[in-house]
Amino acid sequence: MKICIFGAGAIGGYMGVKLAQVGTDVSLVARGPHLEAMKKNGLRLIERESDVTVPVTASENPKDLGFQDYLIITLKAHSVPSIIEKVRPLVNEKTTIVSLSLIHI
């Protein structure tokens, strides 16, 4: 099963680590310094009782990642309209899209 998380902030990063820990083929769409850090060092999650780093596939360009079984959108709600065209390379008729977008006031 291939899962892509679009938005690798706090929520997307957390989900990415948890999915990778159980062996899911997970990729993340990110940008800037956070993207470069993930490519170089993996994705790190520090919790009360643990500190884990997992290797992940990450790209700024969704075309690099191919079709996904699930696309999880973890952007702030006001950003979602701007990514509609960008997610097209990730989805086909079998892809399930889940939006965990949050409203920030």
Predicted regions, residues:
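NAD(P)+-binding Rossmann beta1-loop-alpha1 motif at the extreme N-terminus of oxidoreductases
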Residues: 1-47
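Short, functional N-terminal and low-complexity linear motifs
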Residues: 2-7, 51-52, 74-78
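Glycine-rich, phosphate-binding/catalytic loops in enzymes
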Residues: 22, 88-91
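N-terminal glycine-rich dinucleotide-binding loop that anchors FAD/FMN and/or NAD(P) in oxidoreductases
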Residues: 43-58
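Rossmann-like NAD(P)-binding element
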Residues: 56-89
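A short helix->loop->beta-strand "cap" motif at the edges of active sites that frequently abuts
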Residues: 92-96
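Short His-Asn-centered micro-motif
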Residues: 99-100
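Conserved small/polar residues in nucleotide/adenosyl-binding loops
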Residues: 103-105
